[in-house]
């Protein structure tokens, strides 16, 4: 059985890819996919980044941000290059979601850029 939160990320994936294609992004080129990870605990986030690095994933520099309520949160992205294939990105999303869960940090979805 698929986790309810993961199912929401799958729905997000389907919607985002459909919107990108509708807007005319080039579906014949690779897109940079940025998977977002966050935690209020920097040590946990750092351990997640190290775990991802050991898996051979491209880790972007961690950043500190302030939430609307004033709380601080730390975040980093894992960047991949993928075609806009729903099944492929769902599989990647599931792997990222599970990595976040194993490391005790939040998976905050993914984003990409419009490609000409």
UniProtKB/Swiss-Prot annotation:
The keyword Cytoplasm applies. Disulfide bonds: none annotated. InterPro entries: RraB, RraB-like_sf, RraB_dom. One of its GO terms (molecular function) is endoribonuclease inhibitor activity. Belongs to the RraB family. Globally modulates RNA abundance by binding to RNase E (Rne) and regulating its endonucleolytic activity. Can modulate Rne action in a substrate-dependent manner by altering the composition of the degradosome. This is Regulator of ribonuclease activity B. It comes from Colwellia psychrerythraea (strain 34H / ATCC BAA-681) (Vibrio psychroerythus). The gene is rraB.
């Amino acid at each position: 059985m698929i986790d309810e939160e993961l199912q929401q990320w799958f729905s997000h994936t389907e919607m985002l890819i459909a919107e990108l294609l509708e807007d005319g992004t080039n579906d014949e080129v690779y897109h940079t996919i940025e998977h977002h990870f966050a935690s209020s605990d920097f040590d946990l986030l750092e351990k997640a980044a190290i775990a991802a690095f050991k898996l051979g994933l491209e880790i972007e520099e961690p950043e500190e941000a302030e939430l609307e309520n004033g709380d601080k949160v730390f975040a980093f992205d894992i960047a991949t290059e993928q075609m806009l294939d729903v099944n492929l990105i769902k599989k990647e999303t599931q792997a990222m979601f599970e990595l976040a869960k194993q490391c005790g940090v939040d998976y905050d979805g993914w984003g990409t850029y419009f490609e000409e």
